Amino acid sequence: MHRRTTTSISVTAFTLLLGATSVWAQANVSPDLTAALSTGSRSGNNSNSGDGSSSGTSTVDIVVQYKTAPTSAEYQTVTSLGGTLVTQYGAVKAAHYSVPKSAVQTLAANPNIAYMSLNRPVKGMLNITAATVHSNIAKSQYGLDGTGIGIAVIDSGIVSSLKDFGSRIVYSQNFIGSNATDQFGHGTHVAGILGANLPGGTYIGIAPNANLINLRVLDQNGASTDSAVIAAIDTAIQLSYTWKYNVRVINLSLGRPVFEPAAYDPLCQAVEQAWRAGIVVVVAAGNEGRDNSVGENGYGTINSPGNDPYVITVGAMKTEGTTTRTDDLIASYSSKGPTLYDHYVKPDLVAPGNLVVSTLPPGLTLSNQYPKNTVSGNYFTLSGTSMATPVVSGAAALLLQKNPKWTPDQVKARLMATATKNFPTSSIAVDATTGVSYVSYYDTYTVGAGYLDIQAAITGTQVASGSAVSPYINFNTTTGALSVSNVAGANVIWGSNVIWGSNAIWGSNVIWGSNVIWGSNVIWGSNVIWGSNVIWGSNVIWGSSVASPDLILDAEK
């Protein structure tokens, strides 16, 4: 688990934080890149990396976002400054460069550059599941199995030789190693939750006849970079225009800490581009829900790009080993909102993610390191929001099979509106390894709009007509009141005129701790578990530069 410290979002305060060191700063340059210009830590795509600057050299590995598509002249400018174009994207208006530190200030003066940041490290976030969310009924009663829908699995690759996938891995591309075959195990496990379909098999995926697009970005240790993930998203967008692949869903069971508002985060901007292209993007919330490093009890720990308001961000539930839903509880490690900087209400919903059995054959990094997690043969148990995410991606594929003309917003709204909203006030989980107990409260920052119910989503009749971007929270430091606000300029469906009722999205009885009930204006109780200066004040939580693997191998009791 990574540790976080507090720092200001402002450039001025960030400069002061560095003490006597003289640091040039500009609004379109990320604070961590500004700091790297004077520190000389290691490159973001080096095996020992912590950020995007080369130790002992004068170069930095960066991702540059442009306001309009970069031209050949802009690429040539980088070359003339001694830099190298590493990755040129197509649908995403960005580029990955390795440049001398001395060139950054010159590049930042280009009015077409929206934002420059380090090429940051990214890592993966680490049957009963299908029955719990009623996906088995989708096939038996409604004939829905994901047929014709392409799901892009941006992960550690897929072991395509497994019979569980048949011939449904229709495209493979590698963005980090020598080939697209999984060496870590995470991607194959995720793909199995999505679409495993071994004839006569026990472990069947949520959308067992969907086509899988295998885009490998995580190496044998589950590590990657922003640039690799952006390249994979860019490829998925371009493949979506080809009927052969029909990419309608992107699954991102990975992420990293949040460094800036979503409007500047390169991962967030890439997933928004996919969303605008008509692709439903489903992202893991993260597994930092137990983090109390700055006294916030796991709140404010949503990872990037799950902090983006457009995407569907997924938290993890525990099925308690049964197919009934009434005994299911939140996994205490599931990251909680609101998001850093923007204060978006996240996660959007929760799904089963604890002790999930799926495909993961012997001989891969995870199966070698944790042999006790092997169930039998090619099946393995993992827990985390990584495992909950493909459950929702599979659900999205089923909805799109039934409603092929639906937009990503309509899919997101239907899944949220029909999610189960009946929860206990709180629950206690015990870590199976350490024996430490964790208390979870079932507020909107923990469970979002509720617990995924695929049957309810399929049979629902509500169809959203506006944007389904997640709203953000305003905190009045004088009155202590919270209020939900829509994203500026968006025709958002969450307002008081929601077509299925003002309380249907999150429900009317979601409890904040023991004394605060959600509504349009709720009171910030005096015993709130984090101080106002941590999330809401001028000091915001700052994620560490090295992300820990969001993968829970020892699940909760």
Residue positions per predicted region:
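Residue-level detector of buried hydrophobic side-chain packing
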Residues: 64, 78, 97, 107, ...
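Autoinhibitory N-terminal propeptides
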Residues: 2-142, 150-151, 163, 471-482, ...
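Substrate-binding/access-modulating region of protease and related hydrolase catalytic domains
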Residues: 72-76, 145-147, 197-200, 217-310, ...
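Sec/Tat-exported extracytoplasmic proteins
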Residues: 41, 66, 70, 81-85, ...
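Extracytoplasmic/secreted envelope proteins and their assembly/folding machinery
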Residues: 30, 34, 61, 75-78, ...
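Second-shell loop/turn segments in exported
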Residues: 59-67, 92-96, 139-140, 176-181, ...
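C-terminal subdomain of the subtilisin-like protease fold in secreted/lumenal serine endopeptidases
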Residues: 33-44, 49-50, 247-253, 351, ...
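Subtilisin-like serine protease catalytic core
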Residues: 26, 54-57, 76, 111, ...
